[in-house]
Amino acid sequence: MQSDPFGAARRVLFVHAHPDDESISTGALIAALTASGRRCFVLTATRGERGEVRPGVLDADGDLVALRLAEWADACSRLGVAGRALLGTPPARAAGPARVYADSGMAWLDAAETLAGPAPDAPADALSLADADEVAADIAACAEAFGADALVTYDAGGGYGHPDHVFLHGAARAAASGLGLPFFELSDAAGAVVVDASAHLDAAASALRSYASQLRVEGDELVHVGGQRQPIAVRVGVRRP
């Protein structure tokens, strides 16, 4: 792995919003860090229950949440993730009974479908509408349980504006600050260190193939259910805000 910004960190917690985000945004990075001898952990905030489904994958009586979670478990295994958790469920629960943070959904703000914003029908228990202190505490509980010494999540814009991504930036940053841990955001802005994880393209592609309900892999590209194409991310920018 070239351009390693993580220094002495040996146990890195990736905080993501939905099943598939860990593989789409950071699959190659997770594989590279694991290959370097570090242990990587994935905390996923929602079950991705409002995501689109490829035609023919799930019948009318199918359990979408169960499918999403099975895909998530398989993808994490393929990446060599040392531990995974769902926000609101121990070990990612600071106090009180376990709870579910629901997928907020989103709405595209442009015709090219590159910039997202809040959905008008976000449920009352949506992650993006949750108490920020409660979420930060749950993230901190998970970080402590896994012995994390660094946290990674989205930048303040959530990458492409998804409200769950935007919300997690603030909550994860607060959790890292409270624990005194280095906080890294995924970024292509000036000052970001670009980690070249291209040697781990195959691992990233393998993890992405776990998500057959949502996307398909064609060579070094992934194709979303809506037809949008993007290169598999093997050069990943991170920075300390």
Sequence positions of predicted segments:
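Active-site rim/loop-helix segments in enzyme catalytic domains that contact anionic ligands
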Residues: 1-146, 178
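The feature marks non-catalytic terminal segments
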Residues: 2-5, 95-105, 125, 146, ...
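Histidine-centered active-site/metal-ligand motif
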Residues: 16-18, 162-165, 211
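Structural signal for conserved beta-strand scaffold positions within catalytic alpha/beta enzyme cores
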Residues: 44, 85-88, 153, 185, ...
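Active-site metal-binding loops of divalent metal-dependent hydrolases
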Residues: 45-48, 156, 188
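Short helix/strand-bridging catalytic loops that position acidic/His residues to coordinate divalent metals
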Residues: 57-60, 157, 191-192
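A structural signal for well-ordered alpha-helical scaffolds and beta->alpha junctions
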Residues: 65-69, 132, 136, 165, ...
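Active-site adenylate/phosphate-handling loop in enzymes that bind or generate adenylated species
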Residues: 132-179
